[in-house]
Amino acid sequence: MPVITLPDGSKREFAHSVSTLDVAADIGPGLAKACIAGRVNGELKDACDLIETDSDLSIITAKDEEGVEILRHSCAHLLGHAIKQLFPETKMAIGPVIDNGFYYDIDLDHKLTQEDIDALEKRMAELAKTNYAVDKRVVSWQEARDTFESRGEVYKMAILDENIPKDSTPALYHHEEYIDMCRGPHVPNMKFCQNFKLMSVAGAYWRGNSDNKMLQRVYGTAWADKKALKVHLNRLEEAAKRDHRKIGKQLDLYHMQEEAPGMVFWHNDGWSLFLELEKFIRQKLGQYTYQEVKGPLMMDRVLWERSGHWDKYSEAMFTTSSENREYAVKPMNCPGHVQIFNQGLKSYRDLPLRMAEFGCCHRNEPSGSLHGLMRVRGFTQDDAHIFCTEEQVQQEVSACIKMVYDTYETFGFNSIVVKLSTRPEKRIGDDEMWDRAEEALKQALKANDIEFEILPGEGAFYGPKIEFTLHDCLDRAWQCGTVQLDYALPGRLGATYVAEDNSRQTPVMIHRAILGSLERFLGILIEEYAGKFPAWLSPVQVVVMNITDKQSDYVDEVVNLFKEHGIRATKDLRNEKIGFKIREHTLRRVPYLLVVGDQEMENKEVAVRTREGVDLGKMQIEEFATKLKNQISLRSLNLLED
C-alpha cells in the first residue's frame, strides 16, 4: 500500500502498486491527459513505471523544462521511426537530446538531401498525428541483443556489447513496428510530439572518433506548443541575419582561408575593431592596477613538461623543432607569466602582483569544430594572473568580479549567469584548503551581491573557479569570463616569495579572463549589434558626403578637423546622387552620415543624420565634433538624438 507524497505535501494512499499516470488520473483527468513522466524520489521515471513503496512524486508535464526535454528525446525516436519507414536499409546509431532539440546519427549510403529532410519531417508529422502509444518493455540483455541482431542494427548491438552490462535489463521502446533502446523516460503517447522541425544534416563520426565511419547526423528542434516553436524559429532566422561570418564579409572586417585554417586575416576595419577593444581592456587594466607584460610565442618542451601541459594538453598544442630542441607554441599564457614572476626575489610586500597580457595563443582544435571567429586555432586572450597570498584571495577575486561586470555593462550585457565550480573527486590539497578556497570565492560573490549556482565537482584538480556566462539579445548563452584559483602551477614552476617571517612561501595564482578570446568576443559583438556598433567602437564613425564637386575642398576640411579631434572619419566624393551614397553608407552601418551642400559650406555647418535615418539637423562642425567626442569618451551604446 504505497503512500505517495506530492510536492505540496499532500499524500495519497493506494491499495496496490501504481504508476505516475495512475496517480495523475487519481488527481484529475486534466492532469492525466497532460502527464508525460514522473520524478519519483528524485529520479525521472516513465509515466508507466510502477511505484511499489512509499515515495515522493512530482508529475512532469510539457510545462516543465524536464517535460520538454523528454518530448524532444521522444522526437528523436519519432525521427528514427520515419527514417526506417522511408529508408529501411538505414542502421540507427544514437539519438540524444541537445539544447533546444535533438539529433539522430544514422548509417545510410544514400546522402540525404533537403528534399529527403522535408519528406522525413512530413512522415514524422503523419506518424505523430495518429497519437500512437509508446510501449515500453524491459527485457534481458540477451533479448535486447537478439532483437537488434534480427534487425541488423549493428550500432545498437555495439552499444550493448561495449556499454551495457550483461546482467542489466535494458528498456526497449516500441513505436509501432519501430523499436529503439533508451534509458528513458519517454512520452507515453505521440500526441506530445506535434511541434517539431528538422533543421539540417551534417557528418559525424561514430563515437566521435575520426578512425570510425562517418555517419549522417540529422538535427531537429521540438517544443511543447506551436507558439514556442515559432518563437524559436524566428530567433534562428534573426540569428542567421546576424551571423558574424555574413556581416564580417558584408562590412569587409576579416576573412578566413584554407591555407590557414582557424586563423583570422583581419582587414583594416576589422583590425580597427580589434584595436579599440584592446584599448578599452588596457584602460581597465590601468584602472585596476595591472602590469602589462608580453611572453614569447614558443617555449621549450621542458617547460611545458614541468607545468604539466605536455602530459594533459599536448594533443592540442602545435609543436616545432630546431637545433635538436622541441618547442611548443603556447596554448595559454600562465607558464610564461610564472617565469616573469620568478625573475628577482619577491617579498610579501610585492603581493598582490597582477600581471596581464594580450597573449597570442594557438590550439590545435579539430578542423570540424572551427566556426568563424567563435572557434579558431589562433586567438588573443585578455589573460591575467594574480599572484597573492591566501589571505588576499577574497579581495582579489572580488576586484576581478567588479572588473568583469564593469566590462560587460559597457557592451550592454546585463544578463549574466554565474556558476561556482567546486572540488572534483581527483584533486590536490586537503579538504581544509578547499574549504578556504571555496569559501573565499563564495564570499567574494556575496560581497558583490551576485547570485550564483554551485556546480559540485566541476572545479579543476588544482582549484575552484567562477564562470561568467552572458546572454545576448537573442538569449543565447556565451561563456566568456573566468576566475580560477590555482594552488598547483606556481609550485610546479618554482614560484616563491619571502613571507613576513622570512620563510619561503608559494603564492596562490588566480587565472582571470574577462572577454576570453578577443576574436570570439568580437564575433559575439558583431552578432549582438548586427554590425551596428556603438560609435566609440565603430571602425568608421563618420562619413562626410558632398552633393556636388564644389564642396570637395570643404569635405576635406571637415574630415581633417574630425581627425584632429581623434574621430575616425572618411569622405565620399564620388560623382553619385546623394541618396545613393546615403543608402550605401547606411548599409555599411556607419553611425553618422554628414551631408554638405553650398549652404552648409557657406555657414561652416554639416547636415547630420544617423544610420537609423534620424535627421539631427544642421550643426556647426565644432558643435558636432564636441558632442560626438563626448559620446565616444562615455562609450555610449546609443547614437545622438534629435
From Swiss-Prot:
Tree of life domain: Bacteria
InterPro entries for this protein: aa-tRNA-synt_IIb, aa-tRNA-synth_II, aa-tRNA-synth_II/BPL/LPL, Anticodon-bd, Anticodon-bd_dom_sf, Beta-grasp_dom_sf, TGS, TGS-like
GO (cellular component) term, any one: cytosol
Subcellular localization, as worded in the UniProt entry: Cytoplasm
GO molecular function: ATP binding; metal ion binding; threonine-tRNA ligase activity; tRNA binding
Family matches, as SUPFAM superfamilies: Class II aaRS ABD-related, Class II aaRS and biotin synthetases, TGS-like, ThrRS/AlaRS common domain
Binding annotation for Zn(2+): 334, 385, 511
Residue ranges annotated for the TGS domain, each copy included: 1-61
Annotated HAMAP family: Thr_tRNA_synth (MF_00184)
Family: Belongs to the class-II aminoacyl-tRNA synthetase family.
Subunit structure: Homodimer.
Descriptive protein name: Threonine--tRNA ligase
Gene expressing this chain: thrS
